Amino acid sequence: MTVHQAPGTPGSVISLRPRYDNWIGGDWKAPAEGRYFANPTPVTGEEYTEIARSTAADIDLALDAAHAAAPAWGRTAPAERAAVLGRIADRIEQHLTELAVAEVWDNGKPIREALAADLPLAVDHFRYFAGVLRAQEGSISQLDEDTVAYHFHEPLGVVGQIIPWNFPLLMAVWKLAPALAAGNAVVLKPAEQTPVSILVLMELIADILPPGVINVVNGFGIEAGKPLAINPRIAKVAFTGETTTGRLIMQYASQNLIPVTLELGGKSPNLFFEDVAAARDDFYDKALEGFTMFALNQGEVCTCPSRALIAGGIYDGFLGDALERTRAVKQGNPLDTETMIGAQASNDQLEKILSYIDIGTAEGAKVLTGGERVDLGGSLSGGYYVAPTIFEGDNRMRIFQEEIFGPVVSVTRFDGYDDAISIANDTLYGLGAGVWTRDLSTAYRAGRAIQAGRVWTNCYHAYPAHAAFGGYKNSGIGRETHKMMLDHYQQTKNLLISYSAKGPGLF
């Protein structure tokens, strides 16, 4: 067991600034209006830094820097851009622990997840898109003896990116890596709840990227996010967040006829078929862990398996074992490597989760475990902690239909394959799903029948590069973490060339 020290305290691997300006043109820039907002850590609930409260003027300044940098960066040879991405990956890897501590203090997640998943995935995604870029090819089409069509991939230019608060670094990397690989300059707005860790990363890689290629502007959605998304000087906007906000982003982008990619909400079903319990073996234990994945990252995951659908024939036994597994989840200091579930990212989110627990109870759902705020005592007593909560109820209830974004799972039973698929698809969302079965035919048929962009089969919450990620229905547009994302940050130039000396003879 290792308990890392809080930033700025004796023995800590990192100190954070008492005030953060915006990162524009490769340097710190104070907000145009000179305003800042206090930022608390979810770990203790105490304020620890001030963050630039930016406006449209700061967005314009960042766009100036991005437009100044974009032409040269876009002309950089693919091999050189790939090498830059590789150096960024190396730098993250060299400072993994410092970045993990910053991420925990910013977001509240347990450091075991940041060290084992978030940061290694960030490293791998930069390396992946470096490789994808080197392997990308244009095309040549010979249309007839004298006419050839050449197709070139060209960067869009300057793009806007708006990042959520649940994975502040990893979600930023998911967007930055393909955008940079494609040759774009970026203006990025982090979530106001988690503005710090990305700025720590900017300082770490300042000597690697040309100034202005990445610019980070902090602030609130209406004051900084909207001026970015609606700005005619960006060629694309990428957004991860809540579905209603995603609709607004689409409206803003439509005014300038620019493309969007959106990764939005979810209410993911996790299906456990009867043969899961055919033996009490490693697979059964794996399935129980798959059930408990609703508590990963405190349930603050768009693909949180927040609806558990269990076959009627194994319902009581499997649910009993799942309850035991959930109650064994260790909640504690997020900086302790033994802690499995940390703090919610903000007090607002804490209150939202608690309100949904009240809603579920009022609807008649039964709380099987959890259902309350947790006071960890001492310096952690003001932190934003919720016990992992299991409801038993009906898929028509709000807790089954609405995204809670917390460590809350709603459980119901199904009677046969058709009933399982019907319940799974009875949702507005279609981001993720899980299927657990020992039967390959059931696994394949269920995976194809579920209306979701990512269906984990006998696994859950794996996010490797080269596996496309994105939603159906109200869960978004576009695919990330795959080479196809490079296309979202490029436009195709066609040169249609005639090598004949003779004209067509029309005039």
Curated annotation (Swiss-Prot):
It catalyses: fluoroacetaldehyde + NAD(+) + H2O = fluoroacetate + NADH + 2 H(+). This is Fluoroacetaldehyde dehydrogenase. It is an enzyme of class 1 (oxidoreductase). Catalyzes the oxidation of fluoroacetaldehyde to fluoroacetate. Has high affinity for fluoroacetate and glycolaldehyde but not for acetaldehyde. Keywords: NAD, Oxidoreductase. NAD(+) binds at residues 219-225. SUPFAM superfamilies: ALDH-like. One of its GO terms (biological process) is protein homotetramerization. It holds the Pfam family Aldedh. Belongs to the aldehyde dehydrogenase family. Its EC number is 1.2.1.69. CDD domains: ALDH_ACDHII_AcoD-like. The active site is at 263, 302. It comes from the Bacteria. Homotetramer.
